[in-house]
Amino acid sequence: MPNMSLKKNEMPSQAPDVRNKNFLEVALGYTEEQALDEAQRCLHCKNKPCVAGCPVGIHIPDFIAKVAEGDFEGAYQIITQQSSLPAVCGRVCPQETQCEQKCVRGIKGEPVGIGRLERFVADWHNKNVCEAPRKPTPNGHKVAVIGSGPSGLTCAGDLAKKGYAVTVFEALHTAGGVLVYGIPEFRLPKDIVQKEIDGLKALGVDVQTNMVIGRVLSIDELLEQGYEAVFIGSGAGLPRFMNIPGENLKGVYSANEFLTRVNLMKAYQPGSDTPIEHAKRVAVVGGGNVAMDAARCAKRLGAEEVFIVYRRSEKELPARAEEVEHAKEEGIVFHLLNNPTQILGDENGNVKGMECIRMELGEPDASGRRRPVEVPGSEFTLDVDCVIMAIGTSPNPLIKSTTEGLETQKWGGIIVNEETGLTSREGVYAGGDAVTGAATVILAMGAGKTAATAIDQYIQSKA
């Protein structure tokens, strides 16, 4: 009998007044009993709308059926037919706008907790199964993947499963891309990411760190070395600023730098080589998940007050509703319909405040959201000693500048065939944030999966 409860099983989590002082994971995950109960809520619809809502096409009702039977490893095997990063996706994928949005149970009540079940299954496997996956039979072909973020790891995993010798070239000293430098420990523990990468290595994927493609080696040199195709999944790590007065003051960070120092360099630990000055009042400019991450990190680093400053209303916030809710629970203050006009400094060049102007919403712009318009005479000053800019990122131009014939958008995104990921260069594919600009982990994974299929077809057609 299906569980006809209108509500999901609640996810156990740390209390807000405890978690905003530590970097331990906020959500604690389902117990076996909760997972079994939640799985019984699935109606196993014949047309499976949830699958259509998943960018990587996980067979969702099938894995949930296995959970309901108590066959958690069987569920894991179904998920990993389509996804190389289930423990990651179960934590950071915006299921509420994808698979769960399509769930029929959501018509009346809450949808099935698909993401929570995916996380449970992946965590159960990691805790209970020690057997390494079998290496596929080598097919004699090799592929280079640039970047070890979600698109690169997905592309590498899918190709490795087909027998390709895959080498991943990562610019940083640690593999994982945005999963390790961009997403905080309390949302995505780094040991979870490492386990996913270890699983890919067990399939035969070779991960080389401290390899900046475009400097150490070029794409043309990789092709000359015998790689039959190259996938560019180098992300979008170049921060954007507002170009307002005061952005060069001490105490102004890009969210990219701030989060990298915290997440990858462990700036919150005593003796860190890349510390962050502890601020009392922090303003984070932006309204996406990155802004929420930066604000919540600042709170954990000891800031007395942390503000989100966003030029539209709460309805237009691009961040996940769950992340906004968590930020509010942890004491983050939202200054909505406000926009910075300049950052103020003291005589020593340190941030002492941020001047803002109030906004109101006008007609919709090209994004479909109502355009924010300044309210004349509404200027005010926010008393802060640190400002973090979280208003987006762009791809690094290094690969473009060292790869002849690689076409890009004016803003730097690589131009690709959307159905294959093929760039303007034969045998060179791209996906993820390097193509779209900053987007979600699961969309980057979908692009990596699409490119892996196209790369396989391309190489096999030449064999």
Which residue stretches match the model-derived regions?
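Ferredoxin-type iron-sulfur electron-transfer modules in oxidoreductases and energy-metabolism complexes
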Residues: R19-D37, H59-R91, K108-K135, V262-N263, ...
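Local cysteine-cluster metal-coordination motifs and their immediate loop/turn environment
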Residues: Q40-D62, S84-I107
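Glycine-rich dinucleotide-binding loop and its adjacent helix/turn
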Residues: V121-T137, K195-R215, P239-L301, Q409-E419, ...
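N-terminal Rossmann-like FAD-binding beta1-loop-alpha1 element of flavoenzymes
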Residues: H141-T167, A291-K299
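Feature captures the FAD/FMN-dependent oxidoreductase FAD-binding
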Residues: K142-I146, Q194-I244, Q342-V351, E355, ...
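Rossmann-like dinucleotide-binding cores of NAD(P)H-dependent redox enzymes
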Residues: V168, L172-V207, A295-Q342, A463
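FAD-site-proximal beta/loop scaffold in flavoenzymes
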Residues: N248-A279, P364-A438
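A conserved FAD-binding loop/helix module that cradles the flavin
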Residues: A434-K462
